[in-house]
Amino acid sequence: MPSLSLMAAGNDPSGLAVAPGAVWVTDEFAGTVSRIDPGTAAVAETIHVGDRAAGVAVVRGAVWVVVHPLSGHRGGTLRIVAAIPRLDSIDPGRAHMPFPPQLLGMTNDGLVTLRHTGGSEGTQLVPDLAVSLPSPTYQGRSYRFQLRRGIRYSTGEPVRPGDFRRAIQRDFTVGSAGALFFSDIVGAAGCTRHPRRCDLSKGIAVDDAAGTVTFRLRQPDPEFLYKLTLTFAFAVPAGTPDHDVGRRPVPATGPYLIYRYEPGHELVLRRNPRFHEWSRAAQPGGNPDQIVWRFGVHPDAAVAAIERGSADWGLFAFPFSPPGDRLEEIRTQYAGQVHVNPLPETEFFALHNRVPPFDDVRVRQALNEAIDRNVLVSLYGGPGLARPACQVLPPGLPGYQPYCPYTLDPRPDGAYTTPRLALARRLVSASHTAGMRVRVLTDPGFAPATYIVSVLRALGYRASLWTASGGRFRALSSNSRYQVQISRGGWAAAYPAPSDFIDPLLSCGAFRPASDANGNAAQFCDHRIDQDIQRAWRLQSSDPQAAGRAWASVDRLIAGQAPWLPTVNLSAVDFLSKRTGGYQFHPQWGILLDQLWVTHYRAGAASPASP
């Protein structure tokens, strides 16, 4: 008898029943029941049942299918108001801040993803466009994926194995920040040196006939599957340009497509007619028929729009938030509509370790001792949005253990109390650097930077602000050629792992001299700490608990060397309208917009009224 594979009947078989001359298999998310000929192992017939086919049984020759009804919350328009002036990009290879997972995670897909649900389960890896999660082979240096069958882009073009190699090659070609995540793929070093000639055919082998993608790495990477969840690894079809797509989105695979994008004004998502739900864990069908996102709305106007019901959701996080006292009023008055959640993010100033006076560890430690982090909490929006930070890792990440050596009477619980200005002045005196000119690089209007200037002056430096914005700011802060002394920074975890904070930002390998692509703005390199980083890496796949302890140790060692001036860890405030339900907060992506539902909608409703 031929070998029988349930996958022949669909991507997500949910039930099986055997009858004389037939095997019946249901596929829940395709809404089908299929009859397989056991003699040939071929699908002889497929019947669409209209709802989710959860199981099947054969009773006295009759085939019975158990169905779950489709969501009763589907329909309507979800209206979003955002204070951010614009997205940096809608290109999966270029989008980085501020909302790429929330937005592009609804429109596009990779081989794997995080479970699409709120709470701690949201950190679990699940297959997306791949059939299953592969186990690494060849001592952890190879991963082979089998693609799901029958998935198409919104254009009707099928998703092919080569689309995943194209996506990652394109990261190098377009100068994506995501290229750093894939530097261990065989051939990536050549792509870094010559991006326009990037060829990863040796590192990413594709077989269109078999529907497989095989990654070959130079060395084991226990976080490689996490890296494949990022937008930088989302499939892109042939013909995708080797530059930012601008206003023309990459064709969609997810439940929504970008219907219209007007930078700085509006983005509209509508249902992707080619989408079918292949895995509820990875990419469930959304509830709203349409999602309209308006940009550049003042926080006070956004609050007013939600209050009167002309908008459904606003995210308030530094720097796009009402004043702290107004935020507290909202939390009190609309307690049932407001959700506050910590973000996996650390705000900091990078102290450029190879540029005087911050080439002296005593000066770096002095500034960490001198700042009042309670003042900084108020400047970042108050205790509803910020908490003092003295270390690199934010709360919630594996390996995080509260630690604050830069406070009066350091405590085992890591709590911050007050600064030690007298100690800071003694450290500066010992360094013989008082009186030097120091310029603090920041974007315009950033109040915490003004405060840092005042502290530097109190320590005896001739300090001033240096403002730049956009690409100019990024180049100045990253490229060591410009000899910047201190620059504003901030980092949110791309995936739930401590190495995503430490390795790309503070390892020796992350420092690229005289390069705009340098991720280590502090220019920090401590070879002893680097050895500990490598040890923590090696432990991750074999002993996660020991790895967590190792990362906590690395975090403390880095704090002692003070390459950064950590300031706060941020929280986000989600404010929802009364007609909105189904709130879920994903630990990595934030609010799951596609799982919200809106009540009192009119079928076929068009764009929302302006707030």
Model-derived segments and their meaning:
Residues 81-138, 169, 249-251:
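N-terminal lobe/hinge region of extracytoplasmic solute-binding protein
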Residues 206, 365, 377-380, 410-417, ...:
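Extracytoplasmic/peripheral linker and loop segments enriched in polar/acidic and small residues
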Residues 354, 358-400, 558-563:
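Periplasmic-binding protein-like
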Residues 115-120, 220-290, 298-301, 421-422, ...:
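Gly/Pro-rich hinge or "lid" segments in bacterial periplasmic/extracellular proteins
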Residues 259-270, 292-355, 378-379, 450:
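Extracellular/periplasmic solute-recognition and catalytic clefts
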Residues 256, 384-427, 442, 447, ...:
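Structural transition elements
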Residues 146, 165, 173-238, 260-262:
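Surface-exposed binding/hinge segments that line
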Residues 80, 425-493, 572:
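Ligand/substrate-recognition segments at binding pockets and active sites
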